[in-house]
Amino acid sequence: EIYLKGFEMVVKEANPWTVMSSYNKINGVYTSESYDLLTTILRKEWGYQGMVVTDWFGGRDAVGQVQAGNDLLMPGKIRQQDSIRQALKTGKLSMADVDRNVRRVLELILKTPRFKGYPYSEQPDLKAHASVTREAAAEGMILLKNDGKTLPLAADVRDIAVFGNTSYQFIAGGTGSGDVEEAYSVSLEEGLTGAGFILDKGLKQHYLDYIRAEEAKIDWKKYNHVTPPRIVECTLDEGLIRRKAEETDMAMITIGRNAGEYSDRKVKDDFELCADEREMLEKVTRIFHQEGKKVVVILNIGGVIETASWKDRPDAILLAWQGGQEGGNSVADILSGKVNPSGKLPMTFPVRYEDAASSENFPLIGDEEALDIYREFYTGPKGTDRPNIDFTRYEEGIYVGYRYFDKYRVDVSYPFGFGLSYTGFTYSKPRYLRTEQGYEFSCTVTNTGKIPGKEVVQLYIAAPGKTMVKPQKELKAFAKTKILAPGESEVVRLVVGLSELASFDEQASCWAVESGRYLAIWGSSSRDCRLKQSFTLRQAVTGEEVHRVLLPVRQLEELY
């Protein structure tokens, strides 16, 4: 229902050529050694026909990996080859298993453009690729706050004071295997300059000199495989800030966060703002507001941070994420009004970290413990049994994310699905049609403002919840409209299959759809419901029974 669902959708709808097994165990068994996961579920139940590859150095038992249906072991070690040969000699491993895996590897090779002699080019259209990156990043950026129509920037706003280290070293993406060697990375400062804004040169040089000096103190080799340390914000005296407030039209502050493999994020000075960031935010907003100037905060982050304690200070907040090589240009497009923001939050921003249901079971182990993970590729894990370090209990049950916040009526800073626009939208004329496969829902979305824009329409379903434990409502479909001119409308149609209404019956090991009155809820976020319509399923539906696998090996006390 929760953790396998996304993978199932990808496998069934996209039919990928390869699937990678992960490092972790599920209920006591490494994923790369789990026949239940890689064969019973992935192949027998979902019909997957492609190749499965391990993550680098994943798992411990090469023979078990081959038997489980892990076709390619990466990067490949001599001891793995030796153990497979020995298992073939003793009969522990059958040649049929090896042949099956080899066949899948060869089938992948036969499908590749290289094998088919595709005449690849050494001259890709890099400008076109950059244009796609710029557009995609802007589409996903989210306007969290916009008091007094601060954004888009007015025509008389030209001179800007830009504060924050990452304004000048914009974070393009995370660390580890997710990192890429981009050809260039456009900073916020460069993006704003390219859009015709004038940035304070003295402040820019002050930051560049400071960042250069601080980077020289870092032993970068130590952080080859983990997230590098955050550079503390430089100290700015109030006299300097006041001069900038007098000389410029407004201020921008960038808050940056980086993350990647080998270490999890932390609460203090990561989820929460650091003391130096709070000081910068307090000083800049107070002094610029005293001068009647506005302040915009740009969040150059890859995950959730705490916002409730400080979001009342700036006039506008843009969640820019980590926008790739064109990130600074993408932000400038939104700030200038060239692009109307249309992104929506894919997660909830809680008031406090402790408000999240998963907070009691999250492995907050710190960087030193994380460094051991890299060594354990070669030595194997220590074999201890420490909760939230060596294993984690997923005790939220089905109440993951917004489902938990809704069920227990927990106040949030920004709800799931939230995102503002420079214009406004109304929803009307809800309809639904029963089809052979499920339901087709539709509603009309109209741009009621004065600026062209897009809206992400979200469809939540509230189940009867009489015979099965169900969330208050769940997102079942969503779509983004085209660019709607002022006054223009679009009919949005969303399809929800009957199987999407099903829950997993643990006792019967099958999917089931309960009968009764359902509610279709059209919303602009999980807590901004615009339209409601009811429909009735008169007869319960029991789906095909599935294999009883991946059962928990520890006692779980799930939320209900």
Where do the language-model regions lie?
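Short beta-strand elements
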Residues: 528-544
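Glycoside hydrolase catalytic-domain context in secreted enzymes
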Residues: 1-506, 510-522, 526, 548-560
